[in-house]
Design a protein with these regions (language model features):
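Hydrophobic alpha-helical transmembrane segments of multi-pass inner-membrane transport and secretion
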Residues: 1, 75-100, 319-353, 381-382, ...
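Intracellular coupling helices
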Residues: 1, 56-67, 338-379
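Alpha-helical transmembrane segments of integral membrane proteins
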Residues: 1, 7-128, 399
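Hydrophobic alpha-helical transmembrane segments that constitute the membrane-spanning cores
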Residues: 1-10, 14, 91, 331, ...
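Membrane-helix entry/capping segments
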Residues: 7-37, 67-78, 268, 279, ...
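Hydrophobic alpha-helical transmembrane segments of polytopic membrane proteins
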Residues: 31-50, 88, 331, 337, ...
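Membrane-proximal juxtamembrane linkers immediately C-terminal to transmembrane helices
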Residues: 99-119, 158-159, 189, 194, ...
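Mid-to-C-terminal secondary-structure elements
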Residues: 133-317
């Protein structure tokens, strides 16, 4: 039955977790031996423990039912606590992961990600020529605000591409490293980057080919009293710093903002275009850009997407992790419910006479329900008290991987415990 379910569910598993896993993996001798050993071990534990109890009680006592009324079954209760503890741990992890991903998805990254369409220049035309034609084609469109380009793309593009360039140089006798970004005119304005000192690049200003704009992290690394009076020397060429922009997240959010330097180098390969559009009609603006691209490059697929989609693609690993832990939570909950349901049937059978007497003396259905559920709820509470510190420590350690992260609060773990209690009560009620 398990193998049959695996065959049926495998395509969904591959889609859900974006994996090429197949049942052929099980033909590996090591895995096959491990699988057979696991089945035998589970069978031995599942059947061996009841057999051990029966051998201790003796045949006559077992037939009389003394096995069923064996007082407090510590092993049974311990296993239930373990099951619900794992479920609460996984539910807590899923909630924390979800909150962290939502935080990263909605975080202000320091640039306009909602009104900017980005796409690669992957056609036959020269980059500069393609940019010029795009500007000419889109200049009369009311939905288009500005067009610029750069040699790198923000986030992960629709084509799956992500590039970055890092260079090092000497500044006053010490090494300095910076990310290098070559941009076209209007880059700062198109992305709504915030200039905190100096100015942006100016169109048709020849001297700006030897000018740079740096971010705050780069300014801090250079440690100059008057940063706008400083220069960067590369390959015997000196570049004047004409502006400082506020730090923005040009890398994934599991990394601190690194030093960044913007260059306006002429005739450089600018492989990515950014088009800022109005917020009134995003869909029409996207269609206008796509039509313009198809006009100048009719034989090349348009691979444009809004920057917020590019940023969303950088969160794939986290979303896959949510799916995996969430699936584990569901599985743990199902197993806990099965065990709890079996236990409730067993308890009812054991206390049948007691329940009958209570009904005769006038006990209500709700009173009997409370009587039967309070012991189970105690197990869930114990599981919560044991699992919560572990979940808190584990998730706090995981969050340390992110410079930009949520703050853990008790409500997340209370919600996980509440879900476990609700599931337990619904299972018993059934």
């Amino acid at each position: 039955l398990g193998i049959l379910l695996a065959v049926v569910l495998l395509p969904y598993f591959q889609t859900l977790f974006r994996t090429q896993a197949s049942l052929a993996t099980l033909l590996n001798p090591s895995l096959l031996i491990l699988l057979i050993f696991s089945v035998l071990l589970i069978t031995l534990i599942a059947g061996g423990y009841p057999a051990l109890l029966m051998s201790r009680l003796g045949t006559l006592q077992s037939l009389k039912g003394k096995l069923q009324v064996n007082g407090k079954n510590r092993l049974r209760n311990s296993l239930m606590v373990l099951q619900f503890g794992i479920a609460i741990l996984l539910i807590s992890g899923t909630l924390v992961l979800w909150d962290q991903v939502e935080f990263m998805r909605t975080k202000d990254l320091g640039f306009n990600k909602d009104q900017v369409i980005a796409f690669p220049l992957n056609g036959k035309l020269n980059d500069q020529k393609a940019i010029e034609l795009l500007r000419n084609t889109l200049q009369d469109k009311p939905n288009i605000v500005s067009i610029t380009a750069s040699n790198n793309i923000l986030g992960i593009g629709k084509d799956g591409n992500r590039t970055t360039s890092v260079l090092g140089f000497e500044h006053k006798g010490r090494g300095v490293d910076t990310h290098m970004l070559v941009v076209d005119a209007d880059y700062v304005e198109t992305l709504d980057l915030n200039i905190i000192e100096g100015r942006s690049f100016r169109k048709n200003l020849v001297s700006d080919s030897l000018s740079v704009i740096i971010n705050q992290a780069m300014a801090k690394q250079m440690n100059e009293d008057d940063i706008l009076a400083s220069q960067i020397t590369l390959d015997d060429a000196s570049y004047n710093i004409v502006g400082v922009i506020e730090d923005f997240n040009f890398q994934e959010l599991d990394q601190h903002i690194a030093p960044m330097t913007l260059f306006a180098l002429p005739n450089w390969n600018l492989r990515n275009v950014y088009v800022k559009v109005t917020s009134q009609n995003l869909e029409q603006a996207y269609d206008d850009v796509k039509t313009a691209w198809n006009t100048i490059e009719p034989n090349v697929e348009f691979q444009g997407s809004f920057l917020n989609e590019n940023i969303e693609r950088t969160l794939r690993n986290e979303r896959t992790m949510i799916t995996m832990i969430g699936s584990g939570s569901v599985l743990a909950i199902i197993l806990s419910c099965i065990g709890l349901f079996a236990m409730s049937l067993l308890i009812v059978a054991q206390r049948r006479k007691e329940i009958g007497v209570r009904k005769i003396v006038g006990a209500s259905v709700s009173a009997i329900t409370v009587l039967l559920t309070k012991d189970f709820l105690k197990l869930v509470v114990i599981a919560f008290l044991m699992a919560t510190p572990i979940a808190w420590w584990t998730m706090n350690k995981w969050l340390q991987n992110y410079p930009y992260r949520i703050d853990l609060n008790i409500w997340i773990f209370l919600a996980a415990g509440g879900i476990a209690v609700l599931i337990a009560m619904l299972t018993i009620a059934v």
